[in-house]
């Protein structure tokens, strides 16, 4: 009977939201995006915080649906490889590269990335370079006590 109660308690705890062990890359990451100037378009650098939970990364900057919004999302494999998706809304036309330089347009692209326990690097996939331009991502994991101090 005691084993049955312990077994039942385990499944109740699991059903109540037990998530299992944390992912290898879980934590708070300082994220920097640098997009090179291209074809008369200005370059830029953005800084924001991304969070990894269960080896799934999410970071964003700005207000969803508004100009200059950027979100990056994706799963990091156990070997540190990740194909992340960056999506957002274009900013001023002076920073928007490609044939359609309209402000306020939705966009998305992939970021091929590699993570270690403490850092990561990624590159925007640019295809033939007609629409995309080189963008470089760096990720630096915050120490656990630094993440707690910066909610």
Where do the PLM segments sit?
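Sec-dependent N-terminal signal peptides
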Residues: 4-13
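Amphipathic alpha-helical interaction segments
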Residues: 12-15, 36-38
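Boundary at the C-terminal end of the N-terminal hydrophobic targeting segment
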Residues: 16-20
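Central antiparallel beta-sheet cores of small beta-barrel/beta-sandwich binding domains
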Residues: 22-116, 121-151
């Amino acid at each position: 009977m005691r084993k049955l109660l312990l077994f039942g308690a385990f499944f109740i705890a699991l059903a109540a939201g037990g998530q299992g062990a944390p992912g290898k890359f879980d934590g708070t990451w300082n994220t920097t995006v640098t997009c090179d100037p291209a074809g008369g378009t200005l370059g830029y650098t953005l800084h924001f915080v991304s969070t990894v939970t269960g080896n799934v990364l999410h970071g964003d900057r700005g207000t969803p649906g508004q100009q200059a919004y950027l979100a990056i999302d994706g799963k990091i494999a156990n070997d540190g490889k990740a194909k992340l998706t960056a999506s957002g809304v274009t900013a001023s036309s002076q920073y928007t590269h490609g044939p359609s330089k309209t402000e306020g347009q939705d966009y998305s692209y992939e970021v091929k990335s590699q993570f270690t326990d403490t850092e990561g690097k990624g590159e925007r996939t640019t295809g033939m370079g007609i629409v995309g331009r080189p963008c470089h991502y760096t990720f630096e994991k915050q120490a656990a006590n630094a993440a707690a101090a910066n909610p």
